[in-house]
Amino acid sequence: MALRNFNPITPSLRELVQVDRTSLWKGRPLKSLTKGISKTGGRNNQGRITSWHRGGGHKKLYRIIDFKRNKIDISAVVERIEYDPNRTAFIALIKYEDGEYSYILAPQKLSVGDRVMSSQDADIKIGNCLPLKFIPVGTTLHNVEMKVGKGGQIARSAGTSVDLVGKDSGYAQIKLRSGEFRLVPLDCKATIGSISNPDRKNINLGKAGRNRWLGWRPHVRGVAMNPVDHPHGGGEGKTSGGRHPVTPWGFPTKGKKTRKNKRTSKFIVKKRK
C-alpha cells in the first residue's frame, strides 16, 4: 500500500504521512468475531503503573484472530481485508467451505477472492499454512509457531517475516529480521508470505494529539524531573544527568542486555545483531 501526504492547510497536516487505507473494508468488523476490551491505563490489579505513558485513546473492539489455523484440509476464500486497531498489520476475513468465518493476519499480496488453506498438502502459496517440515528451504514465512499447537508467535507485526534457512535433527532453522538464527520444531506451523502494511514504518503522526488517540501519553525525560522522581532529576539549570543513562529504578539502560530466559537459549543458534 502507498503512503499519503497532505497539503499543509493546517500545521498538523504539514508533516502528516499516513498509510493509504482506501482499499480496505470500510464497514464494521464481523460481530461474532469481536469482543469488548477494557483499558488498563498502564495499571496492574493494584492500581500501580506498570507500563508508563499509557492511557486514554479511542475505544476499540478486539478482533479474535486465528493464530493456530486448526481447520485442516478445508479451503477458505478471502472475503475482505480489514484494518485492525489492535495491531499494526491488516487482517483478512476468510470464509471456509463449511460456512465458518475466521480472521487471519493478512500477508502482502493477499487479495479478495484468493483461496487459502491449512494443510500439509497445501501449495506453497501466499496465505497457506503448513508444518515447517513440508515447506522448502528458502521460503519467506510469518506467524511461526514456537511450540506445536500453541499458535503463531514469531513475525506477526506489520511488514515482518522470517526466512527458512535449513532443517536438521527435527528442527527448522529460521532467520529473524533482527539477524537472530533460531531453532523451531519441524512440526510447528507457519504461514507463507510476509505480513501486510510494510509502509507503516514510514508514517509520521504529525501532532501529539494523534498519539493520544492511540492511547499513548507524553514521555517525560528523567533529566526534566525532580530528584525524588528519577536518578537523573534535579540540578541547577539544564543538567545533563551526571551519570550513565539509567531507568527510574537505577538499572542501566540504552543497550544493557536484559534477557533472563536461559531455558530457551539453547534454541538460539546466533544472537541478534
Curated annotation (Swiss-Prot):
Q: What SUPFAM superfamilies has UniProt attached to this entry?
A: Nucleic acid-binding proteins (SSF50249), Translation proteins SH3-like domain (SSF50104)
Gene Ontology terms: cellular component: large ribosomal subunit
Q: PROSITE patterns attached here?
A: RIBOSOMAL_L2 (PS00467)
Instruction: Give the source's domain of life in one word.
Output: Bacteria
Q: Name one GO molecular function term.
A: structural constituent of ribosome
In residue numbers, the region (Disordered) covers 228-273
Does the keyword Ribosomal protein belong to this entry?
A: yes
Biased segments, Basic residues type: 254-273
Q: Which family does it belong to?
A: Belongs to the universal ribosomal protein uL2 family.
PANTHER family recorded for this chain?
A: LARGE RIBOSOMAL SUBUNIT PROTEIN UL2M, RIBOSOMAL PROTEIN L2
Q: What does this protein do?
A: One of the primary rRNA binding proteins. Required for association of the 30S and 50S subunits to form the 70S ribosome, for tRNA binding and peptide bond formation. It has been suggested to have peptidyltransferase activity; this is somewhat controversial. Makes several contacts with the 16S rRNA in the 70S ribosome.
Q: What is this protein called?
A: Large ribosomal subunit protein uL2
Organism for this UniProt entry: Rickettsia akari (strain Hartford)
